[in-house]
């Protein structure tokens, strides 16, 4: 919640579902929060602050381990954090929050996978979702 001025017209929240834990477990970690949790946060802040909340960034891109960049990470490794099935689940998760505006982080990644890695799986999921 903003403390000073100016205050925004609406607030946003970032949702990263599957990330690399480089500090404790050194493995991929899936945040356990159900979609309704974010909808609940949005509802509470709307009640108290009267502002709409959007998903300003929903993870829809692979999260490479150990600070690697996407190009230096194998496709097999990238699929451990985001494959076509997980992307489909991510779209459904975003919708299940109940928020009307969801901005996805990863469109350029889907394009990269299709054009550079010759893997259209994510691009195809996105095409189906945006019909």
Where are the regions a protein language model picked out?
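Glycoside hydrolase catalytic-domain groove-lining segments
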Residues: 1-68, 121-126
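Substrate-binding cleft of secreted/luminal carbohydrate-active enzymes
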Residues: 51-131
